[in-house]
């Protein structure tokens, strides 16, 4: 298999945050989605980074003094992020995809213009490998 599209969860099926969301909006969206990390996009659909629960925790402590009212006034792009998930282009090799997935729970996939088109989860890659290595009887 040499096609990233095989593993892709399309943008329409992904949870994501817009870069103009407040900290409170991000917390609520992440709670509903049930994810510990979520992509950040701008309103043009371009990938801007990844927000993780730990980033939110430190932002609430250091920027908002643990006050949800203050979290309504601060934007998520003000939050120092420890590490963004590095995207791959849709034309990337499977080797590049697997290398990124070894260090990230998901790999954002972008087109040639930097627009987010979806993501590939580490789980999808592992499940594919498991199916190929341990063929069902």
Where do the PLM segments sit?
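The conserved cystathionine-beta-synthase
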Residues: 16-35, 41, 86-104, 110-113, ...
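Alpha-helix boundary recognition
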Residues: 8-9, 31, 61, 80-81, ...
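Short, Lys/Arg-enriched, disordered terminal segments
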Residues: 1-2, 135-137
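Bateman (tandem CBS) regulatory domains
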Residues: 1-14, 71-84
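Regulatory sensory and allosteric helical modules in signal-transduction proteins
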Residues: 59-62, 78-88
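Short beta->alpha transition motifs characteristic of CBS
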Residues: 35, 39, 46-64, 103, ...
């Amino acid at each position: 298999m040499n096609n990233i599209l095989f593993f892709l969860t399309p943008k329409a099926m992904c949870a994501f945050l817009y870069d103009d969301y407040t900290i409170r909006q991000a917390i609520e969206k992440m709670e509903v989605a049930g994810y510990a990390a979520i992509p950040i996009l701008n309103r043009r659909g371009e990938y801007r980074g990844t927000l993780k629960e730990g980033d939110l925790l430190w932002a609430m402590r250091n920027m908002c003094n643990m006050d949800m009212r203050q979290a309504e006034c601060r934007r998520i792009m003000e939050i120092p992020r420890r590490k963004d998930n590095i995207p791959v282009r849709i034309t990337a090799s499977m080797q590049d995809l697997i290398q990124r997935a070894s260090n990230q729970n998901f790999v954002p996939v972008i087109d040639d213009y930097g627009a987010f088109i979806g993501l590939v989860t580490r789980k999808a890659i592992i499940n594919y490998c498991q199916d190929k290595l341990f063929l069902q009887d």
